[in-house]
Amino acid sequence: MSKEPGLQDAIAKLADVVDARRADFEAGRVDPETSYIVRLFTKGDDAILKKIGEEAAEMVMAAKDSRYANLDPEKQAKLVGEVADLWFHCFVALSQFNLRPEDVIAELNRRAGI
């Protein structure tokens, strides 16, 4: 029986992929046309931050749609997808600023007194 990956595994794996793409970008190893992540890094801070704003707005709209639809499973699934998009783009921003999700987790733990 295989162990199902947990939240920490998924976060670390995705952050590793984003960081690897950033390294590829910095070394000029990947054509931005073949990698969405590299394309974001190529466009720079403003484009990455703008994308986070767009994804945050889409998440808010999906949450409102879910609430107005009495938490309909399809609307809930849309909300989950939008949160995933937002988190993904936040991981890109963290990498852009030489940070990792673990830095955010450490801050959350500090706030929780852990």
Model segments located where?
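Flexible "arm" and connector segments at domain edges
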Residues: 1-83, 87-114
